[in-house]
Amino acid sequence: MIQEASFIMLMGGDPFKQKEMCEKLGIIEDLKSFDGIMMGFSAGAMLMSKYIIITPCSLEYPEFRIENGLDFDNLSIYPHNNTSNIEYPDVLSVGEETYKKQDLIKVANQYGKFYLLQDNLREDGLTDVSIIKSINGVIEYYYEFDGKIWVVNHDIELLDKKINKVVI
């Protein structure tokens, strides 16, 4: 059934439950070999990643949890890192979740670089959007309004929108 589709959208929720459900349905290999367009939002983007990454950030996730994802194009996504700052703060609180810069860097040192994406709902009702498009290893970055993408490696650096594609 999956191979007959031309488009698959993986939605949000708990990325580990989403992966478990796909395993129980026996569709992991079908998703990995899918030849159409696949889009992931939130947990869906995390499932498409090389690694599903959660740092200790809340009562729901008090410890590091990192599992293999579908590994499309060897990149990993960690969504919902919403801040208006240009410099990534040492501690970022988003709702009931708290992200520590040192925890994010620790993961990158062990598992390789990954991307933090912003999808901030603004006071004016608009949403700051950031998107990564990857086709066969060719990566493009898209932003709307004040969307941001950070690269986590040995530090956390904001991608320079001047040298990356900026459209939506």
Report the location of each language-model feature.
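Short capping loops/turns at secondary-structure boundaries
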Residues: 20-24, 41, 70, 97
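Portal/gating segments that form or line small-molecule/metal binding sites
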Residues: 1-17
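Catalytic-core regions built around general acid/base machinery
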Residues: 1, 24-36
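Residues that form generic nucleotide/phosphate-binding pockets
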Residues: 21, 30, 106-110
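Catalytic nucleophile loop
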Residues: 11, 34-51
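C-terminal and late-domain segments of enzyme folds
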Residues: 7, 54-168
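Glycine/threonine-rich flexible loop motifs
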Residues: 15-24, 88-89
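Glycine-rich nucleotide phosphate-binding loop and flanking beta-alpha elements
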Residues: 15-17, 45-47, 84, 132
